[in-house]
From Swiss-Prot:
Its EC number is 3.1.11.-, 3.1.13.-. GO terms for cellular component: cytoplasm. Keywords: Cytoplasm, Exonuclease, Hydrolase, Magnesium, Metal-binding, Nuclease. Its cofactor is Mg(2+). The lineage of its organism: Bacteria, Pseudomonadati, Pseudomonadota, Gammaproteobacteria, Enterobacterales. Belongs to the metallo-dependent hydrolases superfamily. TatD-type hydrolase family. TatD subfamily. PANTHER family: DEOXYRIBONUCLEASE TATDN1, TATD FAMILY DEOXYRIBONUCLEASE. 3'-5' exonuclease that prefers single-stranded DNA and RNA. May play a role in the H(2)O(2)-induced DNA damage repair. GO terms for molecular function: 3'-5'-RNA exonuclease activity; magnesium ion binding; single-stranded DNA 3'-5' DNA exonuclease activity. NCBIfam families: PRK10425.1 (NF007745). PROSITE patterns: TATD_2, TATD_3. This is 3'-5' ssDNA/RNA exonuclease TatD. It is found in: Cytoplasm. It comes from the Bacteria.
């Protein structure tokens, strides 16, 4: 089982990053993709991945929250990072019209620029979409023939949005959001609609701690070592064996991100 979304650069991991990675290994997690959300964190993510060759990789990109800081210098930084063997995707990039930390036009500009970069470098894209599906799809669609792959990270949309993402050829990233009885029930019902070869799993640690873990962790911080719980629950709701699902999502991640 491979965790495609770990925010290991977060200050919440500042005191025990190495132990976090060790616990993930001990839990049977077969690899980690460390998320880059701005130029600085993308550089930090690449360095962290360097420390764990063959186990950790990273993305390089600018999250829509940070889109207002996009510049030609940012693009050049990402391009340089993408030359390293650790960086296997462009992103996290996309649109977030829920919190609007950057203006919509800034988000759209940075998103389009990163799709162009991914097409140029022939790297898959690690996508973010929240309450912005129509504009997200409109910007993404023209680039699809030029992209080598894409995943809708932390998908939390509707059935119609899921069907649209699948029709665009996207892989679907599912997090512990689906384990939340308050807001994950609709998503839970959609799990069987995702083709096995398009499904990816992620913790989005330190965020989105699964709410249905028993006993509950003493800390509210999520960790990649909790991925087996997500695998177990998603397998249950898809009516398949957890071991089979774990092997499938590991295979899917390695295929999408072209890992050795």
């Amino acid at each position: 089982m491979f965790d495609i979304g770990v925010n290991l650069t977060s200050t919440q991991f500042a005191k025990d990053r190495e132990q976090v990675v060790a616990r993930a290994r001990d839990a049977g997690v077969t690899g980690l993709l460390i998320t880059g959300t701005n130029a600085l964190e993308s550089q930090q993510a690449q360095r962290l991945a360097e420390w764990h060759p063959g186990y950790c990789w990273s993305t390089a990109g600018v999250h829509p929250h940070h889109a207002s800081a996009w510049s030609a210098e940012t693009a050049n930084t990402l391009r340089r990072l993408a030359e390293s063997e650790q960086v296997v995707a462009i992103g996290e990039c996309g649109l977030d019209f829920n919190r609007n930390f950057s203006a919509h036009d800034q988000q759209e500009y940075a998103f389009d620029a990163q799709l162009q970069l991914a097409a140029e470098l022939q790297l898959p894209v690690f996508l973010h979409c929240r309450e912005a599906h129509d504009r997200f799809a409109a910007i993404l669609q023209p680039w699809l023939p030029k992209l080598v792959g894409a995943v809708a990270h932390c998908f939390t949309g509707t059935r119609e949005e899921l069907e649209a993402c699948l029709a665009m050829g996207l892989s679907i990233g599912i997090t512990g959001w689906v384990c939340d009885e308050r807001r994950g029930m609709e998503l839970r019902e959609l799990l069987p609609l995702i083709p096995a070869e398009r499904l990816l799993l992620e913790t989005d640690a330190p965020w989105l701690l699964p709410r249905d873990m028993h006993p509950r962790p003493t800390s509210r911080r999520n960790e990649p070592c909790f991925l087996p719980h997500i695998v177990q629950q998603v397998a249950l709701w898809r009516n398949e064996a957890a071991e089979t699902l774990g092997a499938q999502v590991d295979h899917n991640a390695r295929q999408l991100f072209r890992l050795a």
